[in-house]
């Protein structure tokens, strides 16, 4: 994200950050080389503009960080939700559109929910300020893995520029077989005290936060 406001890294900030991760042997999954090109977010394969979410269409209460009203926030959320769940675009955000084809292993997908939408700002070293609109969308699905049912949460963070163009979609995929396997292994192993099995389905136990913060008691 820093590369959006300082493309050349002339102060060596990003290189120093990556070097510190390499030195400690901390590497992101599926990244073969710890280089700037390998770890930076990639834009969508196709150019997408969301109607009604360009800055000229937004209403503010004086400051760009303050929406004009709750109704304006709802309007923005509806515009985002309608776009990302459109069957033409849903795959780009790794969401399941209403009545859309389910990914392999998924037997049911709940409607996607826009959890938040807000303006962000970042200051460049030369004093410029970069504005974006950031929306968070979640979706839950039920996976059937060898007769065992459990829910997997997914969704995406959508970064939209002042012209309403989608700059980034950072997502969690439902159709990742490795992710499904890792979650099932965790529910049966190190996280089993948070889950119970009812018939074929794994379900979260009551008072999960209390169990989490209460240690092994």
PLM-predicted stretches and their roles:
Residues 2-217:
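Non-catalytic terminal regions of proteins
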């Amino acid at each position: 994200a820093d590369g959006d406001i300082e493309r050349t890294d002339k102060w060596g900030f990003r290189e120093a950050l990556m070097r510190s991760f390499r030195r400690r042997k901390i590497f992101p999954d599926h990244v073969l080389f710890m280089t700037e090109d390998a770890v930076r977010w990639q834009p969508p394969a196709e150019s997408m503009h969301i109607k009604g979410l360009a800055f000229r269409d937004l209403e503010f209460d004086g400051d760009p960080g303050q929406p004009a009203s709750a109704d304006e926030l709802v309007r923005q959320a509806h515009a985002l939700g309608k776009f990302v769940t459109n069957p033409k675009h849903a795959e780009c955000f790794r969401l399941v559109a209403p009545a859309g084809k389910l990914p392999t292993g998924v037997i049911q997908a709940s409607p996607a929910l826009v959890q938040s939408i807000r303006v962000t700002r970042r200051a460049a070293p030369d004093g410029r300020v970069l504005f974006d609109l950031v929306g968070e969308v979640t979706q839950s699905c039920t996976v059937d893995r060898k007769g065992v049912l459990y829910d997997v949460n997914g969704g995406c963070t959508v970064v939209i520029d002042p012209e309403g163009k989608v700059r980034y979609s950072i997502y969690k995929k439902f159709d990742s077989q490795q992710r499904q396997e890792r979650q099932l292994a965790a529910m049966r192993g190190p996280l089993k005290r948070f889950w119970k099995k009812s018939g074929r389905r794994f379900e979260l136990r009551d008072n999960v936060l209390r169990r989490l913060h209460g240690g092994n008691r």
